[in-house]
Structures are given as structure tokens and as C-alpha cells.
């Protein structure tokens, strides 16, 4: 079977990680291609037999070129879809999904579109309008959260709840144990939605002994990095800013706790990856699916959005009680089978067969 994925870029994001993981898993038995909009190389390793196609690049430096190049890119996408005959197209992320629906007009190949953020994350009124207008014309839509499934079923005929696979499921034995260090992690883009400021303020509200005895690391890059470094200094907290990192595994192996501070999420990769490394997860009750991944006080902890005091109290609770932390991560490991690549791959193939035979 010929399967073609479409995505804007293969940078270090969570959705990009998922696409590469799926492509690598499917290419062992199927012919897999990836069409991407941007010229940059894939941040994640692709198997050699995955065909990578980059659309023609256009200028975006002036208003005229921004408008003209969007139209040219749409035509380039349509041309690529025509030239790469496939049994199914699978597009990732909202604006790419919209572009693919319009670019596929008149083509018979079924299109599955895949959402990787909560529906509320898309703020632009124009893009929300285009999403509402175009999504009914896809052949199927995959979503990550139960609330998103309910939302999209109002206007999309076939909506499937498909969790993200975790590439660590083939690398890490669930019987494996890790020598932990006094390390607390924040991993993610440094932007307003991920709210890393909350992490810094929570550290500042910790017991002083804990601040001295633990290392706090921010792994990720983005528009707020410089501001956050100044913020850490002004709060008087010691935080290491590592920037974008390739070997996140080494951090998970050492870390005792991971903090997620987002306002809006789909199915956060870090809350899944950390399961395999016995990292205790503390997350905001982000809009609108934290309960899909964490049962509060059983296999992790939930706190209110932007509530740094609550985050600090949960951190103190876990960091002062190692047995509690171990109990939490033991319970959390039970979720790992939900994200095994073989399990998710099977679900994707079932959905592909469904749209092909519809």
C-alpha cells in the first residue's frame, strides 16, 4: 500500500515526532512518502526507505510575495498530490489539513486529516472559519482527546480517537529501572501557551532547602527564552536553560519529576514519553484533556492553570516523599501499553482500510 503523509515542517515538535514514528513503523510493510512544505531537514531520524519530498520554496519577504507565495505553494501542493499517486493521504496539523482539503479537490485518493492540538488552540478567526468550512470534506479526522472528538463530530462524518504512539515503547523495557538524580524538568517550546513562567515562579515558592538540593532544567527554545533567563535571575532561582536538545532520553533517565504548565494541549508528548522513565508527572489541568493522561493523585498530579503556588506545593509533596513518588510512577507505567507503536499502527491501518472501502 502507498501512504503519503503531508506536513509543513519536520522540526522538533511533538506532532512531527509522531509523524516520523508512524512513517518509520509503516515503511516496513508499505511504501511511505512524506511531503513537507519547508526546506529544513527532519529533526528526527527517518528510515532510509521513507521517501521525503520538499515543495518548491518561495519568497515571503514582502506583502506581495507573502500573498503570491501562498497561492504558489497551494498549487505546488496540488501538483505534488497529483504526481504522488497513493492509496491514502494523511495530513498533520490544522492549517496543513485545510490546505490539503482544498488541494485535493477533484482527486479520488482519500484524505485523513490529523489534529494534534485541542480545537481551542487555533485562535485566528479566519483559520477557524476555514477549518469549519473545509473539515466536513475530509474522509476521516483523527483526534487526541475525548473532548475534541465530541466537538468535531458535530460537523465531520468520521472522527477517530487515536492516541499518539511513543517511540520509546520499542526501546525501553517496562521492567527497566533508572538511577534518579535530584532533577526536575520542564520540556517544551518557550512560548506563552506552554507558560514556562509558571515553572520558574513555582521554583521560587519552594522550600529553600529543596531549591538548594535540586537541579531545575528547562529544555526547549522559543521566543521567551531571553525573557525567562532574566525572570529566573530576578526571582533568584537557579535554572539551567539547555535550549533545544536532541537527546531528551538522557534527561528522562535522570529526572525525578516533569512539570507541564500549558494552558491548551492536545495529547502532550512529554506526558507520554516520561511514563517509560519513571518520571513523576505534574501537569496543569490544561484545556481540555489532562484527565485523558493523568488520574490525579494516582498516577500523577493536576494543578490549576497558571497556579504556581499549587505547583510548588505538589513539587514539595513529591520531592519530600520518595516512596510516594515511586508509587505514582509505578501506577503511571500501567498506561504505557496504550501508546505502544504496534498497537497504534494497527489502529491507523484499520482507519485507512475504513476510508479506502467507504
Which residues does each predicted region cover?
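Short hydrophobic beta-strand element within catalytic cores of glycosyltransferases
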Residues: 280-284
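Aromatic "clamp/platform" in nucleotide-sugar-dependent glycosyltransferases that forms part
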Residues: 244, 263
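A short, well-ordered alpha-helix in the C-terminal region of glycosyltransferases
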Residues: 310, 317, 324-338, 350
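N-terminal strand-loop element at the rim of the active site
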Residues: 5-13, 17-21, 25-65, 151-153, ...
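Carbohydrate-associated surface elements
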Residues: 147, 165
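A conserved mid-protein helix/loop that constitutes part of the nucleotide-sugar donor-binding site
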Residues: 16-21, 98, 182, 186-205, ...
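Short His-centered aromatic/hydrophobic patch
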Residues: 91-97, 115
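Conserved acidic donor-binding segment of nucleotide-sugar-dependent glycosyltransferases
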Residues: 296-297, 301-308, 317-322
